[in-house]
Amino acid sequence: NNLNLPLENFYPLDGFESHRVWVDSKMNRIYLDGEDMRGAIYAVYTFAETFLEVPPLWFWCSWVPKHKDVIKIPETTNIFFKSPQVRYRSWLPNDQDLYRSWTKLSPQNNEIVYETLLRLKLNTFEDADLAYPGIGEGMKMCKKYGIVVTSHHMFMLNTTFANWDKYWKNVRKVEKVPELSLANIDKLKELWEYGAQTVVESGVENIWNIAFRGSGDQPFWILFPDAPKTEAERAKVINKMLQIQTDIIKKYAKEENPYIRTTFYDEMADLVTAGLVVPPANENMIWTFCYGRRDHYPYSDIQKFNPETPVKLGYYMNLQFTSTGSHLAPAEGPWKMEFNYRYVNSKSPLYLSVVNSGNFREYMYTMSANAKLLWDYDAYDSDKWNRDYAVQYFGEEYADEIADLYKDYFYAYWTQRKPDFPGGMERQSIFQDQRYARAISYIGDDFFHFSPKPLPDLYMYERVPGRVFRIVPGDNGAETQ
């Protein structure tokens, strides 16, 4: 229902997602006001956090509510949040080895992450896979909670080549699945058109993604038997496929410039930096840059980014990285996160952010810091935020000690090489839990044989030799690994 307010009592809002909690003492009313749907949701959660003392991470910290006979709200209350500085603010639940089975134990387990995302005033979630037929459960949950859907960096129009057989068997009902090859371009288009049509018909608020990679987190030439052999020829294929996908999106979205993102991850970062891959560019195309793979700092492509390029800027940072990074214990921390995001924002105003959040629970601390930064860069400082967090979750009495413990924890990680980031960077490379696990495994497998370099790279397509561990013996006063 619409509530008619006297004009003299009305407070204007700012823009998308802006919100206000205020008291009209003359009318004896409390207003929770939002510019739009998510703004209204954020206003409700602002009221809950401020006056009911429900912290955003109430579920994850085993919070126990305090009984209140009376809730006092000052008549001067006027809590205003302008529009967030970063338009799209997302989590990526990647490598869910612990989280996936836990969500099946109860409906609350399955849905609490969406509530938490909104309580922290984020608005986007990377879970865009289709179900063949129809949209997947992740997209349905985002629609239920009013959350924007976006896709992992290997997704093309909400699908990957891992779904190739599923599409042909479940949707097209064919007995013989067509060969997955570059020569079969019409079949590739059919897969992508189905994805575009399905998403549009679902009504989900979706940021489109274009990419051309393998069936998993690998270059396309690992998967396609007829892939070219040179970097230049491979880049031509990628350029062609990205344009085809863009045209399909425009056809089904019925927009000239819908929001589309592409992510420069691993081989894409190198090909873009070399000028071989040139993605489509327009005012609503979001070029999403990444950290330096296996270590989390702005990579060479964003360092060389020309801010005059007519695109919007996105950034993807891993707080979690399964194969060689932090997976069971948080390692990057708010200070390193802040450095990354301030550097990227100095290139051009950031429009989209994604943090890889793994199984969630281990990373809620830094994810909360990231959410606060993305709303208002000017108001954020990691040291101040760290203490505020300690006060909120542990109380004023122990806040200083708890805040010191958090910072000491993150700065205790071994930095196995000196930084080479232009201008310097604290903790550019650190030895996270999965690096230790793999190093110990390699050493154990060959324990009785000496090698000056016992730690090999993981994959045949590892693009930077030695980056899996990045141990520089000389930086540690040693001659060998």
Question: Which sequence ranges carry the predicted segments?
Answer:
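C-terminal non-catalytic alpha-helical accessory regions
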Residues: N386-Q481
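Catalytic domains of carbohydrate-active enzymes, especially glycoside hydrolases
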Residues: P107-E137, M141, Y145-T150, S346-L352
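Active-site-adjacent "subsite" loops/lids of carbohydrate-active enzymes
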Residues: N158-E193, P310-N318
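Conserved, mostly hydrophobic/aromatic
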Residues: D36, K121, M285, V344, ...
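Active-site clefts of carbohydrate-active enzymes
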Residues: G216-I222, T309-P334
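Gly/Pro-rich turn-and-neighbor structural signature
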Residues: K66-I73, G136-K144, V177-T309, Y411-D433, ...
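An acidic-aromatic substrate-binding cleft motif
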Residues: P55-A128, R213, V311-G314
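Contiguous, structured surface segment used for ligand recognition
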Residues: N1-K82
